[in-house]
Amino acid sequence: MKKSILITLMISLSLLIAACGNGNTASNNGNNEEANNDTSSTGTFTIGVIPAQTEGAMEGAMDKLQSILTDELGRDVEVEVYPDYNGVVEAMNYEKIDMAYFGPLSYVIANDKSGAKAIITQLIDGEPFYHSYIITHSDNPWNSLEELLENSQDVNFAFGDPNSTSGSLIPSIELQDRGVYQSDDEHEFASVRFTGSHDATALAVQNQQVEAGAIDSAIFNQLVESGKIDGEQIRTIWESDKLFQYPWAVHQNTDEETIEALQSAFLAIEDQEVLDAFGATGFTEASNEDYESIRQAALKQGLIEE
């Protein structure tokens, strides 16, 4: 009998200890959840940047931008230039970054894949627009795209990154409409290459490694103004219609307080090195609707689905 009572007491004590342990575990889980939430709002804020120019050309400016945003947001900010446009799209898709600097096309793709939300774009002389240029060396005889394409089989042509709007999407549609380009494997040129960035395309044309190339007008103008490219050696032979400028987009779950703080910080940026890295003169607010024309172009090319 005593033995039975002792066993009953031991079982009761074990259950009591287990219950207390579960209570502590629940409490600890709650604390961990709170800690995780705190980290999401005050931990390092990560920004991925497409290589609009080669990484070395952007490094100093990105360090400055990182410092500016760290001060304005009151939290650590880390800015990283990715080796290609698609890397930034995938980083947003897999939640490796909180914000991204996209080209219009890469933004449309990211919005389609992960719900990325445009909140800022850049200004060029007070306007949020730019163009796609097709350029050639001034030693060449062509003064227009029509003249260039008369003997397209003798032309080595350069695009930028495959996911660039002005360096690939828009000029490729123009060349398709003119019947000389379907893809990098099917075309009427001597060769087609992708340089990976706008400054690399400009240098390829200037150094006569290719006869013509597609480039962002704002970055081209900035390269000339900075002396990185000799404007006397380059001729623009085609210009697209206006394109809405490159967006800065956040993860779809970003809270409004953070969005407003980011918008305020970007609108206040006046540092010339930072602005020059993007070929910009300032920043302004943006929305998803600003990129509807690019979305339609991406649908036409089969880059996204309806």
Can you annotate each of these PLM segments?
Residues 15-19:
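C-terminal motif of bacterial Sec signal peptides marking the signal peptidase cleavage site
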Residues 22-28, 150, 156-174, 261-306:
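Ligand-binding clefts/hinges and TM-proximal coupling segments of bilobed small-molecule sensing domains
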Residues 36-62, 283:
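Extracytoplasmic "Venus flytrap"
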Residues 50-51, 123-133, 228-264, 276, ...:
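Periplasmic-binding protein-like
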Residues 64-74, 166-194, 222-229, 299-304:
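Ligand-binding cleft/hinge of the Venus flytrap
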Residues 86-100, 113-114, 130, 150, ...:
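Short helices/loops that flank or line small-molecule/ion binding pockets
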Residues 101-114, 172-177, 206-207, 211-231:
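A ligand-binding cleft/hinge motif common to bilobed small-molecule-binding domains
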Residues 123-180:
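A conserved helix-loop-strand patch within extracytoplasmic ligand-binding domains
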